[in-house]
Amino acid sequence: LAAFENDGLVRDPDTSIAGTEVVEVTVPSGELVTLSTGFKVTAALAVESPGADLPELVTESPTFVFEDDSSEDYYQVVVYDAVGDIVWDASNIPGGSGGGPVEVPYAGEPLEAGMYYQFRATSIRDKNGTITPISRTEDLRGLFVYSP
């Protein structure tokens, strides 16, 4: 699986490109399954903070910082708690088209002290109303624990 190491790559989320569809496979107990379907990867949006490499202690309301994509129209940033519930979802964050890192201050409900969180950013292209995700941050980055 492409998601289980920090290698600067993510499964390409652009569904307008052949071979990028999410593949789901049900494996009956004790049976072998052969897969003929592949998938494509693309460069991930690099997380700068918090949680660029390891979970990071955050003592104030966080600002999420990640590398700017060069071809996005806007971003979406979603914050999850330790059990995977969405605690904040910000869409239509303006892109800079490759002009330095993107900084997004957290503007959701108060975070719970001692809770682990993760932010994920997705770059979005909007071509004549057709919305297409083109890259995102890696699944194992952007982790932080809130401790005011």
Predicted regions: what is each one?
Residues F4-S36:
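Structured interaction patches on ligand/partner-binding surfaces of diverse proteins
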Residues E60-E72:
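Conserved aromatic anchor
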Residues T26-P62, S147-P148:
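Short, compositionally biased P/S/T/A/G/V-rich stretches that sit at domain boundaries
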Residues D68, Y74-E112, D126:
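Recognizes extended acidic, P/S/T-rich segments that occur
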Residues D7-G8, G84, I131:
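Residue-level signal for glycine
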Residues L45-G51, E72-Y80, Y117-R120:
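Secretory-pathway ectodomains
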Residues S16, D126-S147:
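Extracellular fibronectin type III
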Residues L1-A3, L111-G129:
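Beta-strand-rich modules
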